[in-house]
Amino acid sequence: PAIAAYPRVQFLLGHAGARDVGDALAAAQQYPNAWLEIACQGATQLAGLMGAIGPERLLFGSDWPFYPLAATLAKVLLVTEGKPDARAAILGGNAERMFAAAGATRSVS
């Protein structure tokens, strides 16, 4: 697959694979250059992703205007309750790290 052929390219898998979340998770487990954007995944699925690969390669995404922004944010806040580092990573820190790994030179801060 392309993700294996281009290890220096960062791949952001939208909606964490949507209905194919198992395939997206397998890719993230196998390839360190795979990141999962979590729009449209429920709180239970998000908790499962965090348990499987940790929060370090999960990125906040809302899929707005098709999915309510508040719902996506609420599930992140729920699943990361008491885990401030995970919350900060998912809500922005991971995006900065992913873009830095891709060669971006300007911070979003």
Predicted regions mapped to residue ranges:
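Conserved, mostly hydrophobic/aromatic
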Residues: 15, 36, 63, 87, ...
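Short gly/pro/ser/thr-enriched loop/turn and capping motifs at secondary-structure boundaries
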Residues: 43-44, 66-68
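Generic signature of intrinsically disordered, low-complexity segments enriched in small/polar residues
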Residues: 9, 34, 67-70, 102
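Mid-to-C-terminal alpha-helical segments outside catalytic/metal-binding sites
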Residues: 55, 70-109
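Catalytic pocket-lining loop regions of alpha/beta-barrel enzymes
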Residues: 1-59
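Short, solvent-exposed loop/turn segments at secondary-structure junctions
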Residues: 18-19, 65-67
